[in-house]
Each structure stands twice: as structure tokens, then as C-alpha cells.
A protein has these predicted regions:
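Binding-site signature for planar aromatic cofactors or substrates
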Residues: 1-167
Length: 167
């Protein structure tokens, strides 16, 4: 950053407690094939008090509405243990040229779902913070390449259908 440039700012979106409508549509579980490479960063609080990071794919997250999400995660993961113990989480993703930080609380609603035995958590959004710099835009977040996209897409569709039963 040069001396005459303003510092980056955390700005509030139109509603500081709701997802933007475009994100609700992105996480409606419909156009999964368009989101094969996208990841959402999920941070929880580890038992040791330190942040613990994980990634969610489009097939593991469903927007019920602008304030509630459902997520499907591996049952034996540190993330599942952290959410069961503490419930607090932050989702981070790129949207509209900015980084969104979504703070939320969660609670378990089901275990051993689908053939993979996934755990399902309901996520209630408490705040949405938009981090946007006047001098730059965020172009992308975490992305990945699937080795077997057709197989994964089929599994994601099954997972989204399962999540919808809890909506």
C-alpha cells in the first residue's frame, strides 16, 4: 500500500445479519455444476482455543434463507467435534469483489446421513461483514480441481437432496 492510499476497510453490506440475495441463490443447491471448483472457508474454534480451518464445497452447503444455512460435514472431523462442543463458526468467501466474513452459531440436527455418514448442522447467521478495499477487488478465493467431477457431482446432488429434508 502506498502512503497516499486509504487503508482497506471493513464495510457492512446492505443487511449486516443476512446473506446477500445473490449468495442465497448461489447456495440454493441448484446449479452445482457451475460451482465445481469453488470452496467456502470454514473456521471453527479448536479445543485448544486456536482457529481450525476447513473447506466446504457447493455440495455441502444449502441456504434455507438469508439467515439460515445447512451444512453437511464429515462425522469424525475436528470441525464436527468443534461445532458440537462450541457451535461458533466463521465462513469466508469472495463475493462481488470483496471478502465476506460470515459469523454464525450452529447446532447439530442429524448424524449418519447419506452413505458417507455425514453430520448435518443448522447454521444461524449472526453477522455478515464485507471487507472491501477502495484500491482493489478480490477476484477469487479457495478453488480446487475435482479428479472425478461426474462422480462427485452425483454425490453432491444426493447430499443437497438430503439437506433439503432438514430445511
Amino acid at each position: 500500500m502506498q502512503q497516499n492510499e486509504p487503508p482497506p476497510q471493513a464495510m457492512q453490506p446492505a443487511s449486516p445479519t443476512q446473506l446477500p440475495a445473490a449468495l442465497v441463490r448461489e447456495f440454493d443447491g441448484e446449479h452445482l455444476e457451475a460451482r465445481l471448483a469453488d470452496a467456502v472457508h470454514l473456521s471453527t474454534v479448536g479445543e485448544d482455543g486456536w482457529p481450525h480451518g476447513a473447506q466446504l464445497s457447493a455440495g455441502e452447503i444449502l441456504a434455507v434463507n438469508a439467515t439460515t444455512l445447512l451444512i453437511a460435514i464429515w462425522p469424525q472431523s475436528s470441525t464436527t467435534a468443534n461445532l458440537a462442543r462450541d457451535g461458533r463458526l466463521t465462513l469466508s468467501l469472495v463475493h462481488d469483489g470483496a471478502l465476506l466474513e460470515i459469523r454464525a452459531r450452529s447446532h447439530a440436527v442429524a448424524q449418519r446421513q447419506t452413505a458417507l455418514g455425514l453430520s448435518v448442522f443448522r447454521v444461524e447467521i449472526e453477522s455478515v461483514i464485507e471487507h472491501r478495499a477502495k484500491y482493489a477487488e478480490v477476484l477469487s478465493g479457495v478453488t480446487f480441481r475435482l479428479y472425478e467431477p461426474a462422480q462427485v457431482l452425483s454425490r453432491w446432488r444426493e447430499q443437497i437432496a438430503m439437506l433439503r429434508t432438514f430445511a
